[in-house]
Amino acid sequence: MFKKMIKRISLTSLLLFFLGSVNIYGADAICYNCPPQWADWASQLKMIKKHLGYDIPHDNKNSGQTLSQLLAEKNSPVADVAYYGVSFGIQAGQKGVVEAYKPRNFNEIPDGLKDPQGKWFTIHSGTLGFFVNVDALEGKPTPKSWSDLLKPMYKGMIGYLDPSSAFVGYAGAVAVNRAMGGNLDNFDPGINYFKKLAENDPIVPKQTSYARVLSGEIPILFDYDFNAYRGKYKDKANVVFVIPQEG
């Protein structure tokens, strides 16, 4: 029987380890928030199976849903490992739902990107910007700035994940706020921006929306560069990644 731990992955990416049993799932290990369409988890889980022999099923929770599940299962843990945004990893460590774990080369991770005890650590990072399906714009110019997204021509074409639940949504809200002149102690600029953006009827899903961008359902998504480049170079879609001019 496999010892459970949860180590979480953040957008800087953390891993989290836990104790529990997974026999009811018929799997070797359980990972929360390992969606096949995010950060190429599909390929990663195949490589884990190939090189380590562990069969780990996909899981489509977002960061907030993952933390909620860990808290609900605190006394009877199910997951072995969890992946989520760094802020959720910090909370998980504070709430006592993860065990300390230090993988090989833990000491090489910069101090600001890990918990000293190993309750969370970063495994990758991403640059946030616009993941744009050029064909789905139907001739409209590719937006270059946060301000561009407020133009009426993009009504119904913009999406961002729910900031209250998904880490990438929270990261997007923080990025907008900083670009508009705010900081972590003053979110008014970001709040005012999203009030204006609401006039363009944005789509606000809770789960990763990679496939919805490629299909054209969401032409413009606040997302990370690694998802956009996967669409461009692996799935050969006519997509671009834009870093907003305001930063």
Say what each PLM segment does:
Residues L11-L19:
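Hydrophobic helical h-region of N-terminal Sec-dependent signal peptides
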Residues E99-P103, N238-P244:
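Short hydrophobic/aromatic-enriched beta-strand-loop microsegments
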Residues S21-G26:
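Sec/Tat signal peptide C-region and signal peptidase I cleavage site
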Residues M1-L11:
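Bacterial N-terminal signal peptides that target proteins for export
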Residues P57-D59, P202-V204, V240-V242:
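General small-molecule cofactor/ligand-binding pocket signal
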Residues A27-Q91:
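Early extracytoplasmic/lumenal segment of secretory-pathway proteins
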Residues C34-A42, V78-S215:
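Extracytoplasmic ligand-binding site segments that recognize negatively charged/polar headgroups
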Residues S87-G93, L214, P219-N238:
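A ligand-binding cleft/hinge motif common to bilobed small-molecule-binding domains
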